[in-house]
């Protein structure tokens, strides 16, 4: 049961969290480059 339930939680988590972290890190990198 847990094996079939895990992808339904893991896939949206990766699909939402990973792009958010990538966009945040890219935004901070651009801001840091503009300031300096």
Curated annotation (Swiss-Prot):
It is found in: Plastid, Chloroplast thylakoid membrane. It comes from the Eukaryota. One of its GO terms (cellular component) is chloroplast thylakoid membrane. The gene is psaI. The chain crosses the membrane at residues 9-29. InterPro entries: PSI_PsaI (IPR001302), PSI_PsaI_sf (IPR036357). This is Photosystem I reaction center subunit VIII. The keyword Transmembrane helix applies. The lineage of its organism: Eukaryota, Viridiplantae, Chlorophyta, Mamiellophyceae, Mamiellales. May help in the organization of the PsaL subunit. Belongs to the PsaI family. It holds the Pfam family PSI_8. It is a single-pass membrane protein. Its main location: plastid. Keywords: Chloroplast, Membrane, Photosynthesis, Photosystem I, Plastid, Thylakoid, Transmembrane, Transmembrane helix. One of its GO terms (biological process) is photosynthesis.
């Amino acid at each position: 049961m847990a094996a079939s339930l895990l992808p339904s939680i893991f896939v949206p988590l990766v699909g939402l969290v990973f792009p958010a972290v990538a966009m945040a890190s890219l935004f901070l990198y651009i801001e840091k480059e503009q300031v300096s």
